[in-house]
């Protein structure tokens, strides 16, 4: 009985780790964690989740405000 319970919790934990890794961002973090180089994660969202904080916007995005440090809030062009 204890072996079944341990196996269940192990598989449950592995499922959430795989889901977190496949999303591309660190799921569950309310605040962006700086990388060792001091830069913030590219996947940080801005403008109520409609944009992404980046150093430079992609070709199909336009700058729409500022994020932390010297990052731009980039939104998709419509």
Swiss-Prot record:
The protein's name in its UniProt record = Beta-defensin 105A
Q: Which cysteines are joined by disulfide bonds?
A: 43-74, 53-67, 57-73
Give the protein's function. Answer: Has antimicrobial activity.
Q: Tell me one Pfam family matched here.
A: Defensin_beta_2
Q: Which family does it belong to?
A: Belongs to the beta-defensin family.
| Keywords from the named record | Antibiotic, Antimicrobial, Defensin, Disulfide bond, Secreted, Signal
GO cellular component terms, A-Z: extracellular region
Q: Does the keyword Disulfide bond apply?
A: yes
- Which species is this record about? Pan troglodytes (Chimpanzee)
Q: Where is the signal peptide?
A: 1-27
For biological process, the GO terms are:
defense response to bacterium; innate immune response
The UniProt entry lists the main location of this chain as secreted
Q: Where in the cell is it found?
A: Secreted
């Amino acid at each position: 009985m204890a072996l079944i319970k341990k196996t269940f919790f192990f598989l449950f934990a592995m499922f959430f780790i795989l889901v977190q890794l496949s999303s591309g961002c660190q799921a569950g973090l309310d605040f962006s964690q700086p990388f060792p180089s001091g830069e913030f994660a590219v996947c940080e969202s801005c403008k109520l989740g409609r944009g992404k904080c980046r150093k430079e916007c992609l070709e199909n995005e336009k700058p729409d405000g500022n994020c932390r440090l010297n990052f731009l809030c980039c939104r998709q062009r419509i």
